């Protein structure tokens, strides 16, 4: 069984792989970047799909819990990579999403 810290790190890594896999095609299509960026984008999305299989919970529960982490990581990406300041609404929304994710992920098993 994975520890809580390892599961959290796996969720974050999974989110980064998905975001990179979607951000690179966006750069090609919207920002005029070179088409070769589509190759690492495809690899990143394949990594994302594989990482989802490493999560210890049932697939649907993993996807539901992952959504909260994805929101938080996407907002971190917005701030760090895109340089867009976060609003208090962004932070509040991420906190709510992470709270919901915690309810799903940390429920009693048995």
From Swiss-Prot:
GO cellular component: plasma membrane
SUPFAM superfamilies tied to this protein: Multidrug resistance efflux transporter EmrE
Listed transmembrane segments: 9-29, 34-54, 64-84, 86-106
Keywords, ordered alphabetically: Cell inner membrane, Cell membrane, Membrane, Transmembrane, Transmembrane helix
Membrane topology classification: Multi-pass membrane protein
Subcellular location: Cell inner membrane
Family: Belongs to the UPF0060 family.
Descriptive protein name: UPF0060 membrane protein BMA0761
Organism the protein comes from: Burkholderia mallei (strain ATCC 23344)
């Amino acid at each position: 069984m994975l520890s809580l810290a390892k599961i959290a790190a796996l969720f974050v890594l999974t989110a980064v792989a998905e975001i990179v896999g979607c951000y690179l095609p966006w750069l090609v299509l919207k920002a005029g970047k070179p088409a070769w960026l589509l190759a690492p984008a495809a690899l990143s999305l394949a990594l994302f799909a594989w990482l989802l299989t490493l999560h210890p919970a049932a697939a649907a529960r993993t996807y539901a819990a992952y959504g909260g982490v994805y929101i938080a990581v996407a907002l971190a990406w917005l701030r760090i990579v895109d340089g867009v300041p976060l609003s208090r609404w962004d932070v509040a929304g991420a906190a709510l999403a992470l709270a919901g994710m915690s309810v799903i992920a940390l429920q009693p098993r048995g």
